[in-house]
Swiss-Prot record:
Residues 1583-1606 are annotated as: Disordered. The lineage of its organism: Eukaryota, Metazoa, Chordata, Craniata, Vertebrata. This is Thrombospondin type-1 domain-containing protein 7B. Disulfide bonds join C411-C477, C431-C481, C442-C466, C602-C643, C613-C617, C655-C660, C738-C779, C749-C753, C789-C795, C872-C907, C883-C887, C921-C923, C937-C993, C959-C997, C970-C983, C1001-C1038, C1012-C1016, C1120-C1124, C1248-C1286, C1259-C1263, C1296-C1301, C1371-C1415, C1382-C1386, C1425-C1430. Keywords: Coiled coil, Disulfide bond, Glycoprotein, Membrane, Repeat, Signal, Transmembrane, Transmembrane helix.
Amino acid sequence: MFPKSNLTVTCWVWRSMRKLFLLLSLLLSHAAHLEGKKDNQFIWKPGPWGRCTGDCGPGGVQSRAVWCFHVDGWTSHLSNCGESNRPPKERSCFRVCDWHSDLFQWEVSDWHHCVLVPYARGEVKPRTAECVTAQHGLQHRMVRCIQKLNRTVVANEICEHFALQPPTEQACLIPCPRDCVVSEFLPWSNCSKGCGKKLQHRTRAVIAPPLFGGLQCPNLTESRACDAPISCPLGEEEYTFSLKVGPWSKCRLPHLKEINPSGRTVLDFNSDSNERVTFKHQSYKAHHHSKSWAIEIGYQTRQVSCTRSDGQNAMLSLCLQDSFPLTVQSCIMPKDCETSQWSSWSPCSKTCRSGSLLPGFRSRSRNVKHMAIGGGKECPELLEKEACIVEGELLQQCPRYSWRTSEWKECQVSLLLEQQDPHWHVTGPVCGGGIQTREVYCAQSVPAAAALRAKEVSRPVEKALCVGPAPLPSQLCNIPCSTDCIVSSWSAWGLCIHENCHDPQGKKGFRTRQRHVLMESTGPAGHCPHLVESVPCEDPMCYRWLASEGICFPDHGKCGLGHRILKAVCQNDRGEDVSGSLCPVPPPPERKSCEIPCRMDCVLSEWTEWSSCSQSCSNKNSDGKQTRSRTILALAGEGGKPCPPSQALQEHRLCNDHSCMQLHWETSPWGPCSEDTLVTALNATIGWNGEATCGVGIQTRRVFCVKSHVGQVMTKRCPDSTRPETVRPCFLPCKKDCIVTAFSEWTPCPRMCQAGNATVKQSRYRIIIQEAANGGQECPDTLYEERECEDVSLCPVYRWKPQKWSPCILVPESVWQGITGSSEACGKGLQTRAVSCISDDNRSAEMMECLKQTNGMPLLVQECTVPCREDCTFTAWSKFTPCSTNCEATKSRRRQLTGKSRKKEKCQDSDLYPLVETELCPCDEFISQPYGNWSDCILPEGRREPHRGLRVQADSKECGEGLRFRAVACSDKNGRPVDPSFCSSSGYIQEKCVIPCPFDCKLSDWSSWGSCSSSCGIGVRIRSKWLKEKPYNGGRPCPKLDLKNQVHEAVPCYSECNQYSWVVEHWSSCKINNELRSLRCGGGTQSRKIRCVNTADGEGGAVDSNLCNQDEIPPETQSCSLMCPNECVMSEWGLWSKCPQSCDPHTMQRRTRHLLRPSLNSRTCAEDSQVQPCLLNENCFQFQYNLTEWSTCQLSENAPCGQGVRTRLLSCVCSDGKPVSMDQCEQHNLEKPQRMSIPCLVECVVNCQLSGWTAWTECSQTCGHGGRMSRTRFIIMPTQGEGRPCPTELTQEKTCPVTPCYSWVLGNWSACKLEGGDCGEGVQIRSLSCMVHSGSISHAAGRVEDALCGEMPFQDSILKQLCSVPCPGDCHLTEWSEWSTCELTCIDGRSFETVGRQSRSRTFIIQSFENQDSCPQQVLETRPCTGGKCYHYTWKASLWNNNERTVWCQRSDGVNVTGGCSPQARPAAIRQCIPACRKPFSYCTQGGVCGCEKGYTEIMKSNGFLDYCMKVPGSEDKKADVKNLSGKNRPVNSKIHDIFKGWSLQPLDPDGRVKIWVYGVSGGAFLIMIFLIFTSYLVCKKPKPHQSTPPQQKPLTLAYDGDLDM
């Protein structure tokens, strides 16, 4: 019991343990899963890449943020994600800058062909099954970002910075699938010849290939057995036999096993073993260097068999007749081309870092050691290239190149004037517009930091390294013209004053006069005259008392003695009031005695003002004088005080008593700015070279005293106060050292050896980019250096050295005897020779050297013949006979028969074995013929200025006599082209030509300025030019001319209106107009003298009276009156008071006078005051400045163009329109305009500046006729102003010399040579000839020596190919069919593409059904074509015949084809009814349904099929009465019967149901009966009495009802 219980417990424990283990494993796996799940709960998520920062180009850096994410989407600490798979945060990038848009662009290729869209997933049937017109497709194209400069591909992100990427695919349509279209079968061929089984065949050709998934072409051949095989007659075999030769085996050497002890050789026709045994008597060693290279001669065999016309083999004896074909021949053991080992890789072409992403390249090469022979493998490529990338930060940046320029050279006016007048010569200082030039060169760009560290300036390099347009080498410039100051007139002489009023000394002083500058001088040579003149004087006074007198007041009573009040002020020499303490002591008295006349006293007027001085200066002969006077107003009465004598009525005094010799200071021009030690030490700036550069200096000049009309005098004679400065500060010009570029690199010496003994030199140069100035370091003398290249070796000349030919090597004797059984060794063989390459000093060289310098390697092997006993033998050919000078002569050579051949009849046949060969002698007569058009007229080249870069007008020829050329085609007597040097030394015929010279418009010189058009005020001065010659032939055009062919310039001018004015003297005494002269009072007259004076000099010298204005001449006489003693005497009227500036008419003007003597009878005196209104232009005047228009732009006399000045003049005009003195406007303090001159620019007349002609380009063709070469020139400076326009001819062309073309021409393939067989494998050969032609190979090409064509471009395999001639019974391919017409792919009649297709095909011909399994496949060939047409295909059908007709497909041009038409739309060719018409009297109709015969009607079932044919009643009677109805029963068209057969009035249909028309007729009859009944009722009914009611009145409405109206 216990054991059982223990067992139970054990089982239970074991089961419990199993469950526990299972639970633990589940828990562990779950924990591992959770742990793994925990590891997979966090993932890295990178953000988008940021912008590329850093330098422009490939050195940029791009960064992005990287986060650690939980799978639920929330971010976590970075430590939760694994560091190993963390995405990168930074990467290098190409930073795109805006200027990159000029360097990169999208390059888009053409759209590729439209291809079908791939089938959708799960779609089984092709989409083309439902195609109607076209099917959907896709077109792709290549879009890439490229660098414009070298068309290299870069990252697309660069171009995306500027423009979106163009699409790379688009939808398109593909035409529906088009099956292969073939022509109709040709007629059956004739039955094969012979008796027995005969076959005939027919073929067809492909017209259009299958396209767009269409069906492939069907078989193009059909064969069938002839119907009636002809039995062979007795004695004639059923089959024909042909000798079939097989292909030659590979060339091999004899095996040891082929030779047995008996000397017999067992031939192995099929052996292609590579095992070789070299027999010494069968090989010839060709020594090359120290290593032997044997050319081995082996043999090759072929099989010969007899084949029957049905393709079966037959006994060989049935085919052999006269001779047995050759089955073994000598051959060359093939040897492959042998090359040397590859050289080491060259350094990578990219050796620096640049912005280009294009990799570099490196290459390696190998040489040919032995050429391939015997059909061995040709030489492989001898040069190998591959891309390479050199990486690393230590790699230096690639140099960048940019255009650099020197400073502009000095402006040269001569360059401009030479254009206008080639014979112009400098006659004085020139200024104005000119041309300045500079050097333009290409140099390596240096970073700014490096440029600061390095003192060496840039080095010029080749200009081809710089891209982009070069800076202009010349430009217009301007030399400022110098103009002198414009000054005003001299002022009046001042008072005599001390030289220094602050420290007066001595009794001598100076009187001065001034003038001021109206317009400053311009330019470096502009000069101002002296502005102050002085004269010495006595008793100088700097300050003076100026007293004004009042009227006389009586001291007692009303007359008698009295006094005047004096008012004195102290004034300086300028008339300004100053303190009285400055004037001399004592001051003038305040009172002055005077006398008032009593009633009977004589009355005198007041003294007049002192007149102007009679002279401007005094000399020994005369002095200047001034006068004043007074007049008698009333005579004295009885007892009164008498009048003074006439002498007492005038007073005189001296004036301008100074000498006429004026003194003034003169100055020399300012000297150059020089250093002042003290000033320079304080202001200098120190440059990097430690020398003083710029600062402040001083300028000095000499000052000396000049006496007018005498010259220089002692300086103390001139007042020191007006002495000009002799020293002034100036800016020191910076010292400019000459700066030159570094020398360019030496031009490279040739790495390759040089032919001949010519001296090769290399050179370098440097360019002056800054000239020395202001004492700087001068430029070096050497700017160009040249030296001879060292270690330049002469190229050795290599040539081939062939050895003698070896003896003729035949097939091995054992092989030969094994086949023929003859011991005679004769027939065709091969002979070899060694060819080595040697130098000109007979040293061995590599074969590659000779291959480079020669036109190919000489032959190593050639065929030879060992004559047999039966062969004809000859002596060697003699030399050709000498030629005479006659071109008709021939040369010949001879040979003779030798030995027994002289007696053999076949050897006497001169056609087979000619003994004389004749050739035409070379002829030195050549025929020249002009070809092509004449070239442009070409002028000789002109001189070029090396530093200006411009063509010198005087030396360059743009017109005149030149030459034009025409090519010469030279040919020999046979019409073959030869080198043109045989006919002409240059290959051209030339003749003189003339290019008309342009003549510019020529005008005269400027006339002198005319006088001012106005003598007073503002006028115009004019000068003019007139036309001398008109322009023609493209000369400089004329400016705009007037009707008189003149051009004018006008400038304003001004004449001072008071320059010449009338000066009046004092009035004389009044003379009474009384004849008796008894009365001494009353009216009378008085006179005065007038004269015309020039007031411009300030003194008023008398001039001719005609110069003054005659309209303003003052009166010389006037009426006057002397008051009688008893009359009241008044003084003369004083001046009118001033009117306001506005001339207000409400304002009055007043003048007064006072009583001098009362009347005796106490009568009232005349008025003592007068008033008048201020009226404009009567007694009140206004003044204003008047400005002229700007003048034309005025240049200096020596300036042709450039900076000028435009001026305008200022005048003062009265309100009445009359010009007045400028003083009037100045006195009223009117605002003066500021700018009286402005700068202007006269456009320079610049002729078009052209570069020199470039060198002639290479001929557009290497040989032949039709080639052209050209040269061009460029516009350096376009025409400006009225310059000579640029010529339209910037390119010149001429025909190239007609040189002969030499080409290798392959001949046609020969017929297949079987070498004794009737069919089988043979060989075709063709010739390779050197032909000469004039550009196109045609029938006119002639054959010449092979050496003229150079190295042969073809291998032997191109000149020989295997071929086969089918044996009777063999299945073989036909020749190619003709190319079909060009057909386009079209949709709905419109072309789908521009290029069409045409096809041709080859099919097979079966000659025996037994061999049809071995037939080759038919071949289809398609090529593109142009000029195609759209064709459409339609089904055509013939008329029915016994329910059958012919259906075919026809192309739109009428060609019957197979394919092209839709199979679904094919019409039926056989007419049949389903099910068949088996009912009595039924037949199958054209519609394909059963119908009934005539006289029966169809009874149809519900499903539309015929049930039975029911006889039409009465049809028998009509049939029986044939005689009576014969005239009516004419034949009726069965089709018409079928049409109207269904119209019989049968009430039942074939199914027995009532027809619809029966129901219609019944319904219609019922309606008619009801209508008749109703009508009868109305007619019979009694009518009711008629009652009418008045119509109801409707209200009238005026509304318009449009609907009612409508």
